[in-house]
């Protein structure tokens, strides 16, 4: 029985493949200076990082296409249901041998991963676009202004440099969270 069609597999591997390259190149941009220069030297590091930066910036768009396509294909199958509560109560069958809790197309664990990837992927994509086009976006000022309309009291008067600093921080935190979650997804 074929569970997923060609378009489903294409969407998954477009998103997954680009994510792996984005994770490696992003980690290199963040930590490579400290880890790779002692191993390869400054010249080799500069070449690796320059190529990695271009790959990171261009493959980001492949990730966004994979993310959007995955949302269109699978969002309706990932709406939580009462059956998911039963699946969660049984621990997904991980703790008892031979126990396989009922689920529809996707179980509750897969649904959690799906929504975390959709929300985290959208968030990291938006902050990534803001980083690629500096001084042209005000993602944090705009987001904080919207939150202020529902009762928060957050600052909205950021300089362009402060916006970029917040984008870098957010991009790194969300990316690390996604990498951690995807490692767990692959392992389980």
Where are these regions (language model features)?
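Membrane-embedded alpha-helical bundles that constitute the cytochrome b-like, heme-associated redox core
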Residues: 1-188
